[in-house]
Amino acid sequence: MHKIVLASSSPYRRALLEKLRIPFEFHAPDIDETPHAGEEAAPMVQRLAIAKAQALAERYPRHLIIGADQCCVLDGQIAGKPLTEANAIAQLTSAHGKAVTFYTGLALLNSASGALQACTEPFVVRFRALEDAEIAGYVHLEQPLQCAGSFQCEGLGIALFEALEGRDPNTLIGLPLLALADMLRREGVNPLRR
């Protein structure tokens, strides 16, 4: 069986990958995540997912390396991690009553053969009309300062939404497991067979 490495320091991505019950290591890649001038969301997250996987290929030369990246698009603009409470409140205020699209790029690199699989999975979140006090209360309670879109859907953030639309709800948390399981099976790793 191939050894697997998750190219991420995200505890959320690690928790998602653990759902597949396959042993893996994780290591944070060191890459420049700056968007290119004029780059759109879907190509950007796919490029960064591939770059994260490729960044670990030399360190893990006989592994399947998983890279992932995510961003959210609000009003046609890429919205990054808020980093401060004020920015999180501003993002959620802009999002209330609107649809926000998340793009998650996924890459699986076989570092021994060089075979690369990559895709981008969209996921749409429809926000309820929110009151200012709800937004401020949510940000204070959950502190989603490291989360694209300023929320955690796996926690209290679910109360912000009217609807969720997408193929795989894991995509919204940062790792599309349906697509990843398909990629792993193509590399001979089936989570249902040991």
UniProtKB/Swiss-Prot annotation:
Which coenzymes or cofactors are required? a divalent metal cation
Pfam families from the UniProt entry:
Maf
Give the GO terms filed under biological process for this record: nucleotide metabolic process
Q: Name one GO molecular function term.
A: nucleoside triphosphate diphosphatase activity
> According to the UniProt entry, what is the EC number of this protein?
3.6.1.-
Q: Where in the cell is it found?
A: Cytoplasm
Q: What does this protein do?
A: Nucleoside triphosphate pyrophosphatase that hydrolyzes 7-methyl-GTP (m(7)GTP). May have a dual role in cell division arrest and in preventing the incorporation of modified nucleotides into cellular nucleic acids.
Q: State what protein this is by name.
A: 7-methyl-GTP pyrophosphatase
Look up and give the organism this protein is from.
Sodalis glossinidius (strain morsitans)
Species lineage: Bacteria, Pseudomonadati, Pseudomonadota, Gammaproteobacteria, Enterobacterales
